[in-house]
């Protein structure tokens, strides 16, 4: 069994996330892709939407894809969400599966700053959503060379959108149609997500 792992704040989840996951699933013949929302991200700002809201939006977004599944394991874990802990748990539970960590190129550039990156790559292969020629530090280039049999670059048609742009558009009362799935758009509007700056909450 081949399992893809896509972590993130998903604040909110959008078509860029979904397209990357589906493209990687198809190219690498993954049997399942797990979406794993962070509780408290280690290298990003605290999310604006609550953990419950972000989890529910990811559930809605992945509802109609039988290959996608949402795991709340980081939301249920207290404190900062570290991928090394998540990978340890998944590799134990799915001991016979091949695990593939899906990373956007921005996240991959910071990968060596993550907690225990070498422990992560011991247990998973990495699929990097590359947007063409990128500029990496020498340390990252050495890392790529060392683990060249476990790091794959996926040249996929990039969906030019960011979660911040979506939040800003919501705050300004602008349309987010075609940026997020329709049921996620309805959820954001119905629950007034991203309308208030002081909404930050990790619960």
Curated annotation (Swiss-Prot):
**Keywords noted in UniProt:** ATP-binding, NAD, Nucleotide-binding, Nucleotidyltransferase, Pyridine nucleotide biosynthesis, Transferase
Which SUPFAM superfamilies does the entry link to?
A: Nucleotidylyl transferase
UniProt GO BP: NAD biosynthetic process
Keyword check for Nucleotidyltransferase, yes or no.
Answer: yes
Q: Name one GO molecular function term.
A: ATP binding
Its UniProt pathway annotation is: Cofactor biosynthesis; NAD(+) biosynthesis; deamido-NAD(+) from nicotinate D-ribonucleotide: step 1/1
Source species, domain of life: Bacteria
Source species:
Dictyoglomus turgidum (strain DSM 6724 / Z-1310)
Sum up the protein's function in the record's words: Catalyzes the reversible adenylation of nicotinate mononucleotide (NaMN) to nicotinic acid adenine dinucleotide (NaAD).
Recorded protein name is Probable nicotinate-nucleotide adenylyltransferase
UniProt similarity note:
Belongs to the NadD family.
What EC numbers are recorded for this enzyme? 2.7.7.18
Which CDD domains would you find in this protein's record?
Answer: NMNAT
Q: Which reaction does it catalyse?
A: nicotinate beta-D-ribonucleotide + ATP + H(+) = deamido-NAD(+) + diphosphate
Gene symbol of the encoding locus: nadD
* Pfam families listed in its UniProt record: CTP_transf_like (PF01467)
